[in-house]
Amino acid sequence: MQILLANPRGFCAGVDRAISIVENALAIYGAPIYVRHEVVHNRYVVDSLRERGAIFIEQISEVPDGAILIFSAHGVSQAVRNEAKSRDLTVFDATCPLVTKVHMEVARASRRGEESILIGHAGHPEVEGTMGQYSNPEGGMYLVESPDDVWKLTVKNEEKLSFMTQTTLSVDDTSDVIDALRKRFPKIVGPRKDDICYATTNRQEAVRALAEQAEVVLVVGSKNSSNSNRLAELAQRMGKSAFLIDDAKDIQEEWVKEVKCVGVTAGASAPDILVQNVVARLQQLGGGEAIPLEGREENIVFEVPKELRVDIREVD
């Protein structure tokens, strides 16, 4: 059985930065460190940080006075940010800079009195944070997930209308929704480049190339990871058997029985150690050496806050 690896796969710059912020805060300040929501959507990462003293909470009221609080990579609403400011807390922001870019787009629209439409998945923390940047009572902020949502939507003023997108969506699905928005509201204004981040786009391109060769595609990522789910869905749309797995233990032997080629990729919040474990398990099931496919090179780095720029080895 041939094993192919998608390229790129795994951690993106925003996830790297968010995890480093929590790790460095633990190294500098010691446990406990409070993190609002899972810092990234990966069970292995969250469990590892929890073992080292990170406490993951959903409400600011759960954080004691004087504590260290970190916002997750998904971002938070202005209401959450203001609540944290009103408390005696030291706050570090691990929001991905590409999510912050979308927040700024919404805030500008709010200041101008433009109504805004966000393309995204209801209930996702990134969507909640982005929707929460809009505060103009004279305007309006709306969420759509599909072209059907667009055709049902009524706004106050079609002349002053803009749209934004969640950063981890399906490129193909989002294109369909944007097309519907432009037909429904001809004067709508969008970002010069859509808000889907480079890592989401690159990993979807990579899984498309992977699925062209592999009979079965394994996507390493947690069930609550939006970008990981989109990778599995894309492979399935291409007619391949695709499975979203947290780790190697989730692999069922019948998935790869009599399969000649299996492909492996990982969502942007999944560490490479999990991919290595998946490859090792596939090799136990008869797989050969893992062959990485060619793909886009990624060299983007997002700096951590200057207060947390430390060599952890020196602290240890």
UniProtKB/Swiss-Prot annotation:
Keywords carried by this UniProt record: 4Fe-4S, Iron, Iron-sulfur, Isoprene biosynthesis, Metal-binding, Oxidoreductase
Catalytic activity: isopentenyl diphosphate + 2 oxidized [2Fe-2S]-[ferredoxin] + H2O = (2E)-4-hydroxy-3-methylbut-2-enyl diphosphate + 2 reduced [2Fe-2S]-[ferredoxin] + 2 H(+); dimethylallyl diphosphate + 2 oxidized [2Fe-2S]-[ferredoxin] + H2O = (2E)-4-hydroxy-3-methylbut-2-enyl diphosphate + 2 reduced [2Fe-2S]-[ferredoxin] + 2 H(+)
Binding site for [4Fe-4S] cluster: C12, C96, C197
UniProt-annotated binding residues for dimethylallyl diphosphate: H41, H74, H124, S225, S226, N227, S269
Class in the EC hierarchy, top level: oxidoreductase
Involved pathway(s): Isoprenoid biosynthesis; dimethylallyl diphosphate biosynthesis; dimethylallyl diphosphate from (2E)-4-hydroxy-3-methylbutenyl diphosphate: step 1/1; Isoprenoid biosynthesis; isopentenyl diphosphate biosynthesis via DXP pathway; isopentenyl diphosphate from 1-deoxy-D-xylulose 5-phosphate: step 6/6
Name by which UniProt lists this protein: 4-hydroxy-3-methylbut-2-enyl diphosphate reductase
Source organism per UniProt: Escherichia coli O9:H4 (strain HS)
